[in-house]
Amino acid sequence: MQCYTELTPPTAVTHSVTLQLVPGQGTNLAVAKASLLQIFKTKVVSAEIDTYATLNGTNTSSKAAAAGRYDSRLVNDDDGFEASFLGGDNIAARADRANSAKLVLVAEVTLPGTMTGLARIKKPSGSSSGGADCLLLSFRDARLSLVEWNVERNTLETVSIHYYEKEELVGSPWVAPLHQYPTLLVADPASRCAALKFSERNLAILPFKQPDEDMDMDNWDEELDGPRPKKDLSGAVANGASTIEDTPYSPSFVLRLSKLEASLLHPVHLAFLHEYRDPTIGVLSSTKTASNSLGHKDHFTYMVFTLDLQQRASTTILAVNGLPQDLFRVVALPAPVGGALLVGANELIHIDQSGKSNGIAVNPLTKQTTSFSLVDQADLDLRLEGCAIDVLAAELGEFLLILNDGRLGLITFRIDGRTVSGLSIKMIAPEAGGSVIQSRVTSLSRMGRSTMFVGSEEGDSVLLGWTRRQGQTQKRKSRLQDADLDLDLDDEDLEDDDDDDLYGEESASPEQAMSAAKAIKSGDLNFRIHDRLLSIAPIQKMTYGQPVTLPDSEEERNSEGVRSDLQLVCAVGRGKASALAIMNLAIQPKIIGRFEFPEARGFWTVCAKKPIPKTLVGDKGPMNNDYDTSGQYHKFMIVAKVDLDGYETSDVYALTAAGFESLTGTEFEPAAGFTVEAGTMGKDSRILQVLKSEVRCYDGDLGLSQIVPMLDEETGAEPRVRTASIADPFLLLIRDDFSVFIAEMSPKLLELEEVEKEDQILTSTKWLAGCLYTDTSGVFADETVGKGTKDNILMFLLSTSGVLYIYRLPDLTKPVYVAEGLSYIPPGLSADYAARKGTAKESVAEILVADLGDTTHKSPYLILRHANDDLTLYQPYRLKATAGQPFSKSLFFQKVPNSTFAKAPEEKPADDDEPHNAQRFLPMRRCSNISGYSTVFLPGSSPSFILKTAKSSPRVLSLQGSGVQAMSSFHTEGCEHGFIYADTNGIARVTQIPTDSSYAELGLSVKKIPIGVDTQSVAYHPPTQAYVVGCNDVEPFELPKDDDYHKEWARENITFKPMVDRGVLKLLSGITWTVIDTVEMEPCETVLCVETLNLEVSESTNERKQLIAVGTALIKGEDLPTRGRVYVFDIADVIPEPGKPETSKKLKLVAKEDIPRGAVTALSEVGTQGLMLVAQGQKCMVRGLKEDGTLLPVAFMDMNCYVTSVKELPGTGLCLMADAFKGVWFTGYTEEPYKMMLFGKSSTRMEVLNADFLPDGKELYIVASDADGHIHILQFDPEHPKSLQGHLLLHRTTFNTGAHHPTSSLLLPAVYPNPSSLSSNSEENSPHILLLASPTGVLATLRPLQENAYRRLSSLAVQLTNGLPHPAGLNPKGYRLPSPSASASMQLPGVDAGIGRNIVDGKILERFLELGTGKRQEMAGRAGYVVGTGAHGVNPAGSGKMMGGGGGLSLGGLRLNGLHGQEGGMEWEEVRGELGVVLGWSGLGYF
């Protein structure tokens, strides 16, 4: 009984496509990351605010390199993003005029399936729903889903689903299972149909309906062609609803490729071609099977077929035989080139529409592999395996080539008339950006005229841009032409003019078009990166270590209390994109200063203008009234204090570059009382201090200018201010009698005046919370009011009954929006939403509307803070309003997924020195710029930032350390765009959010340290706090010159040699993350594993020491046996380099053992005597380290093929061995005598990539993952009658992870703040969690559950699966079951004893948080959560405790417990408690 939860989203980009999906956003980019679909748009920003190098975790060296590339292109680029469509005529003269294109996330959807392809499908011209295009998705096991954008729901909507995995379609009985064949999705460029190639040679055709071409052609001329015929409306009724099912597609059908042509027995690749009237497909195939093709040459065939969708028939129009056998891809080329480009490992061949071929050989090996006629460009020495090709400039015949090592090349076609006469390749020089791509590319998608998205599975995906350099003559000519240009034209006009210049009139010849294009767009290309998507894929290996700083340094002293106990370190990426990813759950702030400030209860930093002398004040007001201070440093800090006796005061401090100092001699009165809020108004001419009993206004020198008392003139009451919100020129106060006070500052007198509350609702309603918001994005704009007015300030109020009111200031006559259902927390909030009677309400304590984002893009969000500090986020969106439609009918709020639960308040002793502090309400703080983020901070016992970047959704990240009771932004010369806060321990810190880490992309802190060579493994050495990284660099393979049997090898002189790996060990300092030592292995020696082992180093004293063990393989060809080697290194102290104290460590070789047969593939500790378990070839051997530097074998176990992992349950001698082809072996090791015994085995037909233990109290489970993405739960139980006395392992269940198959794992202890009933562990056995890592970048946990918790959560998951709509029409339950095609051929891993127990899917449980309170209550009751009772002691994440520690939240002395009704409240707390354990990083808080 376990629960599988994915902690991070996949980051490896597998597919991408550009389309017009969302109306009004131009071109969108759809990105597939295995099971995550993301939709982006682009935004052009000035290079002055280009922050991808600072907000996306690039290190110092990479930022310097990026700066170098950036500077080099400034001399050639005027406007960056669109220079090429201006013909390259604009040559940059100033750096501040350069622009960059940025990606902005529009939507993301997690799919219960693995995407294998994306395709753009254009909608018919008459379609009115959504955008101009639909998106077609293909999935494993031959499934298609057609989706479109739903404007009203602001999300993707499924149009149709298509399944083709029927048994009769798979083929012959001897054909391999369906999942072993890759699926290929291709679409016709004119969107007439799409094709899905699945199984061995099946082709599913999905036709799309097309309008009558003669009727719907844009060039219909009524004078020549007569009146346009009327469309047949017989299928429609009066209200517009059709009686005929209106679908954009026709019934699909499946064709066997052999029916197209009998010789299509072994298809390789296919693509739809351009410029054909009917759908036309080009198929590359082989006449021989791959196994029978060795020794044969030129047996590939390229054929072109025209498809008749009505008759379901085809016609062969072209066939080219005798093609090289290393071709692997067909690339369809648009006009004017046309035809198809066949890509091979050693050549490129173009086939035009008439069958004429032109090709080039790109390396010397081509002559030996083919007799096909090719132009020789062998001096390029290119390897085209894994390359990517896309259009760069079609009118110039230029295509971009990206090799598998990331190098850029330019393919140019020579066009004579209407035919292609040849092609050539030119590599881009590194100084022109030819090496900006670091990894192999999986997808290319053209975004604009000079930008292209480059997706990768092995590193960061980037948005690549290019410009063209020109000579002085062309520059001079460009300037002359610029004088005649109309500079008022917009981009679309210029683009249209460009097209007119390129193609001219309809009668213009291709030669004229080409010459015009060359005249406009000549010059060398320069490439640079505009933006990037963070990736931690693939995760090769994981370890954990302690954060470390220089001993006795100021940083070490300052970081005390705000550093995590451990950090997760992963070896990620491949090739030049390899890196170490350092991950922490919470933000680790960069401490600028630290001091004790126990009385601080609130911070507010302000920057105000100096008052102007009266002699300089004109008739129209002060001369500096329009001066913007937003970029100025903060000058003053107001601090609210509470001393030990509970006396409340406020002080003001002057901020300096060195810190801050107390300010005296002003009219600021500390004894006036406790400050509730502070800020500036009157365009920063007045400093506002909101006290509990009054509001004070000061000028820029803190001279008192006005006092506004809180006095009700009618009743004489003096209500006290509870919360306040400032949005110049308005002030909103929420008082303890639930009334509101609204004031406006006059622009001339700069004095506050109360705004008359004309609406009776404002005076008769009790208000719980509220805020002011300045709308800068236009989401809340009133179309009837012009921009630039003060009407963009809105007031949001929440009544005690849970109703949301929105007023547009200064109009207080009536609200512009009323939503009565806010307290029900619905998935979508509108003015018309209504809940059923008796539905439970949430206790909402605070609302805040704030902009979230970064310097690239920010957007408003409505943030609800619940009584237990949980947060709910809503994103507002508008529908296009019709004439006369009220504002409330066009505004909607969409709930944003957030599975982060607040921490429990710390338990305090009853005789606490300050009983008032537990009762004090700490409102959320809006921060406009903290390290470039527009963010919101949540103070209290669960201090958190809500962070968002342009490329991510909002994420709630906690701040490392204890609770926070005061916080403010802090922008000074010594701490730019930082913040100051005081924790509950009385420590105040001036800090910054580190800019070398990423946060919002994965929901945790990620810092990438580039390694530059392929990283295989990483290990942490605790005594020295250093990391050893096992890498493999590539080098040319040299034949042994001293071989006595092959003396001709010494005379080898070939230049194009194969590349092989050579192992390198790198020692990294945990302080500076720099390489301080390097050890190279022998040629052809590859590092396979690196582990830190506690070994016995002395046979006489039995001394133990932490040493680094390395396993390698020597592979010198298939005709020589593979040998292995075991190294044991110590990390010794040496004299450091001057100025580099971290270089005081070096790797020292202690032992080295050659293994004559087989590679050393895995290492582990074993037993209690300091021995090591070595997986060497087909044996697993226990070895001990001798003092003479040898490794003595003491016990062994024979294995079958190839051992992928060995694990020992620490200190028990229980070992687990996984074979790549023969399953899992469970063994035991004894030390007296030395012996290894086989306890049990799994099935011998299971391909195991990784295996590990998962203890659960007195039960011990074995977790094995195979190549198909299945996680198998096995158990050793000799008492079970079917286990043959334990010789066969019991199979408990199998769970499908899709593309996220675990390849690495860590068994970690689970540490909960309070005991949990979810883990079935006795007191003497601590709970454990298995952390899993996959090649897609997904980190996941597998944790055991107790019986009663498993039953409830499993029932809840079933209800969510059956009761919620699922994206793309997929089935989450079927997704987690073993693949149908895989299970048909898969033997059970062990004796079936699962008795129907499946692993609970945490991804489904996360969707429980999407529901409103009514649906939550209903589902929780059905799942067995008892209404009205306690939470059965479930409180692992502190759930079930209200803020303030007293069972409820106190605001101004009022207890808010049960304010909104608590039907089912305890029930929700019980569900929340159990979800808080199984979702997220619960139990792993030490990271």
UniProtKB/Swiss-Prot annotation:
* Single Gene Ontology BP annotation: mRNA processing
Give residue spans, biased composition: Acidic residues. 486-504
Task: Show the InterPro entries listed in the entry.
Answer: Beta-prop_RSE1/DDB1/CPSF1_1st, Cleavage/polyA-sp_fac_asu_C, RSE1/DDB1/CFT1/CPSF1, WD40/YVTN_repeat-like_dom_sf
Q: Name one Pfam family in it.
A: Beta-prop_RSE1_1st
State the residue spans of region: Disordered. Answer: 486-513
Q: Mind listing the UniProt keywords for this protein, alphabetically?
A: mRNA processing, Nucleus, RNA-binding
Query: What family does the database annotate?
Result: Belongs to the CFT1 family.
The molecule here is called Protein cft1
Task: Identify the species of origin.
Answer: Neurospora crassa (strain ATCC 24698 / 74-OR23-1A / CBS 708.71 / DSM 1257 / FGSC 987)
Organism phylogeny? Eukaryota, Fungi, Dikarya, Ascomycota, Pezizomycotina
Gene label: paa-3
